Amino acid sequence: MAENPIYGPFFGVMGAASAIIFSALGAAYGTAKSGTGIAAMSVMRPELIMKSIIPVVMAGIIAIYGLVVAVLIAGSLDSPSNNYTLYRGFIHLGAGLAVGFSGLAAGFAIGIVGDAGVRGTAQQPRLFVGMILILIFAEVLGLYGLIVAIYLYTKQ
């Protein structure tokens, strides 16, 4: 019972919660920031709205990363009497924090790049490819967190 304390599952629940909360915060910021850029750009160039929606979609994908890890963690939560160790709780917390904080950072990057990129593309269409490349690098930050979280999750 010493390695299965009653508070062990608390850390697992905190891992699941932090995975979805922080990645959703990043996705929300990225969506809001790039969405304001799209709204400002569409006043002058309404024909570019559908082309400029890419940053919003990429920001939404960040939340899916957190959702995947949160569902994985929540699916393996169990009571301490059913051999849910403190080690497992810490692993789940680490996995949730990894994907959550990397999703938060990626969402911030996508929002800032998406806002500036959409506004710049409205004035100079050749900036579109550069914006997409930078957005891909920002999205990969969230993907790194997902990879680390899944790797940690499999260590239980």
Curated annotation (Swiss-Prot):
Residues 1-7, 74-92, 153-156 are lumenal. Gene3D superfamilies: lithium bound rotor ring of v- atpase (1.20.120.610). This is V-type proton ATPase 16 kDa proteolipid subunit c. The record marks E139 as: Essential for proton translocation. It comes from Manduca sexta (Tobacco hawkmoth). Proton-conducting pore forming subunit of the V0 complex of vacuolar(H+)-ATPase (V-ATPase), a multisubunit enzyme composed of a peripheral complex (V1) that hydrolyzes ATP and a membrane integral complex (V0) that translocates protons. V-ATPase is responsible for acidifying and maintaining the pH of intracellular compartments and in some cell types, is targeted to the plasma membrane, where it is responsible for acidifying the extracellular environment. It is a multi-pass membrane protein. One of its GO terms (cellular component) is proton-transporting V-type ATPase, V0 domain. Belongs to the V-ATPase proteolipid subunit family. The lineage of its organism: Eukaryota, Metazoa, Ecdysozoa, Arthropoda, Hexapoda. The keyword DNA-binding does not apply. PANTHER family: V-TYPE PROTON ATPASE PROTEOLIPID SUBUNIT. It is found in: Membrane. It holds the Pfam family ATP-synt_C.
